[in-house]
Amino acid sequence: MKNIAIIGASGYTGAQLTALIHAEAELTIQGLYVSENSLDKGKPLADLYPSYSHIALTLSPLSEDAKAKIVAEADAVVLATEHSVSLHLAAWFYSQGLAVFDLSGAYRFSDVAQYPKWYGFEHEYPEVLAKAVYGLAEWNAKEIAATKMIAVPGCYPTASLTALKPLASLLTSAYPVINAVSGVTGAGRKAQLHTSFCEVSLTPYGVLGHRHQPEIATQLGQEVIFTPHLGNFKRGILATITVQLKPGTTTADVAAAYSVYDQAPLVTVKHNQFPKVDDVVLTPNCHLGWKFDENSGYLVVASAIDNLMKGAASQALQCIKIHFNL
């Protein structure tokens, strides 16, 4: 039995992860935490999320005493916190010997030079960063098991990389073009005008400047063109990706490349049949569908995930179970 502390449990991802861990027979929840100045401290989780009324846990402030209690009682800590907050908390809990699963972007790049540009801060813990493993569960299981610092991937990168990594050896130098649409929960729980009911509409954002672009490119080993879109639905991501494959590549070659997922229970791959968001919402699954034109050499692959599940909470749970061999 492994004891897990969840910090940032009041947000969509933290609450979703709480529900997932609560349902796991081999995991227990050491505690749920929010910042000391949070308006949610002291509230039962069910006050914020009535659908979780079966989880009788209260949101505690992350005081120094609380941090000491976590170190004494927990085997691991999950950080569903802002990037700049995770930066420091992850390093501190790692130094105390706990396994850290960070859902922010604070440890996703191995190159410290990336952080000022994409996250607005200098990375102060290069020695911890050097130990961090990118937690793309289907691809990095051995490394996830071997380290105590796991950077859980972003939602768009999870959808995109799951689709693209099997094709890496078949790609030409032409940049893959990724157009991805995410539900409004991807923007977080905090009230914002552009995500309010009367304002939300299908629209691109972060064009040629979204921080997930270099994350995808780094893990793929090739530059990409990535355009995210805000969708007018609650949950889910659909990424439609166009790539050029090397001359002589056949449909059979593509099928062979995607056979890497034959033993991956959470990834479903279909040829000439494309996924929809409704099929993956509230599940930990990724559905892929692809079609290849041998004459032009162009392939289109679509990837559907739930942004709060496979794109965040359920992938964190995958990483926890891989790390602890559960």
UniProtKB/Swiss-Prot annotation:
It is an enzyme of class 1 (oxidoreductase). Pfam families: Semialdhyde_dh (PF01118), Semialdhyde_dhC_1 (PF22698). Pathway: Amino-acid biosynthesis; L-arginine biosynthesis; N(2)-acetyl-L-ornithine from L-glutamate: step 3/4. The keyword Repeat does not apply. One of its GO terms (cellular component) is cytoplasm. The active site is at residue 155. NCBIfam families: argC. This is N-acetyl-gamma-glutamyl-phosphate reductase.
